[in-house]
Amino acid sequence: MRSLILAAALVITSFASGALAEGKRIGVAWGDFQEARWRWDATAMRSMIERNGNKYIPTNAGGSAEQQLRDIEKLVSEGIDALIIQPVDKEAIGPGVDRAAAAGVPILGYDRMIEDERVFYLTFDNVGVGRLIAAIVKQVQPEGNYAIILGDPSDANSTFLRQGMEEIIGAAVAGGQITIVGEANADGWKPENAKAVMEKILADSGNKVDAVLAQNDGMAGAAIEALTSAGLSVPVGGQDGDKAALNRVAQGLQTVSVWKNNFDLAKRAGQIAGLLADGTPMNLIPDAKQFTGGEKGIPVWAILLTPTPVTAENLDVVIDADHVTKQDVCKGAMPSVAACR
């Protein structure tokens, strides 16, 4: 009897070891966790990777392009089967891509484009995000002095977002209905840099700003701080669906936050990385299409998901999706916000 139990235990142990051996090692080179959304993404991504029986191996470069290259070198040397990169700098990441590709490791660029045919690109339609930010702010403020706060100049997303904004406001700028009184990048997408940009625009324009297009919610919040200090309350648009931004929408401080359902994005990344690790060619990833919208026009295989604009009129969308709680979103909300009643 004892020998039977021992034999059974050996079989179970052998099976468990075999199951673990079958799992793939998915390295994730995060650029930073400055924005709350990246921390949410990491949780959802890890959940999907582990649900599929694979191992999640993360690094965090803390906003340093040099550190991210070291992180990728370390991940590749540890024998990962697939690599997800949220690049700090789309150009500086090149040697990291070369290193991973030389080792035969498939690569997924996460929400920030790496314009390289060896890298699968997963993101939202960022040109569409730019359109939504500008369109909703323009509905509220169809003319006047606009300030535009761009993201980091090394991030292709900033270019895509600006392209979308231009599609909405370009004709009004050409026709003189809208005047851009200031436009500048906030290095690293950092709120403190965005606040400095906004303060300079206010100083240069004599506080004559009627609307602000910010390329993410952290920068929108920083712009609102500067506007408030100047005694101004104007339409401000951003994106990411950050909890603080959605609360500002409920309070009437921010006009729109374009929500990119990052849980879906992160889970999809975990799924795709698993497929790539298993040897699935990029062109056979479900829903993949060729994308040539980068600065160099290099064709890459990509999936672009659809974003959702969130205003005071439809805050229930993010609450019902369990993205945020009603309690968090509705603190100090305007009485007119139906989702907060």
Show which residues each predicted segment covers.
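N-terminal signal peptide c-region/cleavage motif recognized by signal peptidases
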Residues: S14-G18
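Positively charged n-region of N-terminal signal peptides that target proteins for export
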Residues: M1-A7
